Amino acid sequence: MERKKRLLKRTASVRIEPYLAEYIQNKLEIEPETGGVKIPYTTDLYHVVWNCMAKPDSHHDVMQDCNLKIYLPSRRSKMDGHPGKDPAYFNYLSSNAAKKIEEHIRLLFNFEFHRLMIENEELGRPLRNQDVVDNFIRRYSLRSISPDALLKNFYRYRQRLFPKTPRKYQKKRGI
């Protein structure tokens, strides 16, 4: 019984963009007993979540309508003077922490999506951009973002990477 209570305390819920929540839930492993997303310790997201973990105050706000449940990392240090954070006690993620986590997940999402699109262009476009977007949406079961929004996102990114400069026309003078 004590183990189950402790496991339930090891999760925290946050509210982020729906498509990012779908992406991270389908990309990472779900912990079967708690239903939280289990983040591998080798990722930057693990350390972002660990740094944002705090003890709940007596007047902390309980987030309603959360769409992402995170299985909190347990990183106990064995060195003197560097205590770890026990997730049973440090199980609160503030709204600012949720924003940081959302920013990092958006960074992961955009990196993977843009990498796929640019890879397709570098290979001579064996697939249409629309097909690459559809494959990406199908792979991560994204229902809350449209393919057009992803294409527009990529076109904006490509424009920032490779800005088009208008051609300078010079009027030819008669010979």
Predicted regions and their residues:
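Surface-exposed beta-loop interaction hotspot
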Residues: 94-98, 102
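Positively charged, polyanion-binding regions of nucleic-acid-associated proteins
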Residues: 102-125
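Residues in the recognition helix of alpha-helical DNA-binding motifs
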Residues: 153, 157
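Short, basic interhelical loop/turn and adjoining N-cap
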Residues: 135-151
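Short, charged amphipathic recognition helices of the HTH superfamily
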Residues: 119-139
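Short Lys/Arg-enriched helix C-cap and helix-to-coil transition segments
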Residues: 161-175
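Long, low-complexity interaction regions most often at the N-terminus
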Residues: 1-93
